[in-house]
UniProtKB/Swiss-Prot annotation:
PANTHER family: AB HYDROLASE SUPERFAMILY PROTEIN C4A8.06C, ALPHA_BETA HYDROLASE FOLD-3 DOMAIN-CONTAINING PROTEIN-RELATED. The lineage of its organism: Eukaryota, Fungi, Dikarya, Ascomycota, Taphrinomycotina. The keyword Zinc does not apply. Keywords: Cytoplasm, Hydrolase, Nucleus. It comes from Schizosaccharomyces pombe (strain 972 / ATCC 24843). InterPro entries: AB_hydrolase_3 (IPR013094), AB_hydrolase_fold (IPR029058), GDXG_lipolytic_enzyme (IPR050300). Belongs to the AB hydrolase superfamily. This is AB hydrolase superfamily protein C1039.03.
């Protein structure tokens, strides 16, 4: 039976403590371990987790942008009873000739948690630092809407950007996709889908995959990080499996390329856009990120992987307290600027 009471935060597991960045360890011990209740995601009901928010501190403040607009993207290409809520951030300044570059972003949360507000800090930083319109997609979540609902929502959002570039004030030749964790999974899938689309859309200029889920069949036998970081903080293996089973209740879907982009055929990899993959060194997902980068590179795709050693899964969302979180932010900015040039 799922627990509904909070527990005392436990110390960092001995199997991983010495591998973690000292800056993270100090922050965890000072501000997390002693002051906050633990929320063991895989032992709590989904509604409890959604209503109690993200207890992990460390995210930087939002950057001021020129404007923020919430819209609902009408559903045109897939089947569902409603459109796709999204938030549009526009940067300060004068748009370049042809329109602003566009960055389509998908938040993390294991396809179960998170929402349009979860990663606004990162979205506003990319908007201002990379001078692009950011479309933050509030895709449907499992278990209410399991696979492939979020993929359909992401596809609607991407095609909306292509088909309504003039209205949005963006350049359809300068569109990038990205996401963190489960959102990185969605972005990777969309990179394959648009490359294979018969609609002849301009190619994406970048896929920015931050601590992405690339292989939903992964386990300790197939991916070393699942063994090494079974008890890593914030995304232990049991927690990842909790997410997977909510999103993919039918195990036969685990190897579907739209759930595990690692399993797209080699012919599909040859056509996808360049990539920057940001992996956390102490993340259960790090091995599959490395394997995905190798597959992209083998296919001739310009792909770079950066590994933030000693960092746990949420390094991107800890840029206010971790130097390596700030470095990741800068790496992402530079990759977008180069792709949009």
């Amino acid at each position: 039976m799922s627990q509904t009471t909070t527990e005392t935060i436990i110390p960092l597991d001995s199997s991983v403590k010495d591998k973690l960045d000292p800056e993270y360890v100090n922050f965890y011990n000072k501000y997390v371990c002693s002051n906050l209740p633990i929320v063991k995601t895989h032992t709590y009901p989904v509604d409890f987790l959604r209503n109690n928010g993200n207890v992990m501190p460390g995210q930087s403040e939002l950057l001021p942008v020129e404007s923020t607009e919430d819209i609902t993207i009408p559903r045109k290409h897939t089947k569902a009873p409603s459109g796709v809520p999204s938030r549009i951030f526009r940067p300060h300044g004068t748009a370049p000739e042809g329109g602003w570059p566009c960055f389509l972003w998908f938040h993390g949360g294991g396809w179960v948690l998170g929402n349009i507000n979860t990663e606004n800090s990162f979205a506003t930083h990319m908007c201002e630092q990379a001078k692009c319109v950011v479309v933050n997609v509030d895709y449907r979540l499992a278990p209410e809407d399991p696979f492939p609902a979020c993929i359909d929502d992401g596809w609607e959002a991407l095609l909306y950007c292509y088909e309504n570039a003039d209205t949005l004030g963006i350049n359809p030749n300068k569109i990038a996709v990205g996401g963190s964790s489960a959102g990185g999974n969605i972005a990777a899938v969309l990179s394959h889908k648009v490359a294979a689309s018969p609609a002849n859309f301009p190619p994406l200029v970048l896929q920015l995959l931050v601590v992405p889920v690339c292989d939903n069949t992964a386990n300790a036998k197939t991916h070393k990080s699942w063994e090494l970081f079974e008890n890593t903080p914030q995304l232990p293996a049991a927690k990842m499996m909790w997410y997977r089973r909510h999103y993919l209740p039918n195990e036969k879907d685990w190897s579907n390329p739209e759930a595990s982009p690692f399993f797209y055929p080699d012919s599909s990899f040859k056509n996808v856009c360049p990539a920057l993959i940001c992996a956390a060194g102490c993340d259960v997902l790090s091995s599959e990120a490395i394997a995905y980068n190798e597959k992209l590179t083998k296919a001739g795709v310009e792909s770079t992987i950066k590994i933030y050693e000693g960092c746990p899964h949420p390094v991107m969302a800890m840029d206010a307290v971790l130097e390596k979180g700030r470095i990741l932010n800068k790496d992402a900015t530079n990759a977008l600027l180069a792709a949009f040039a």
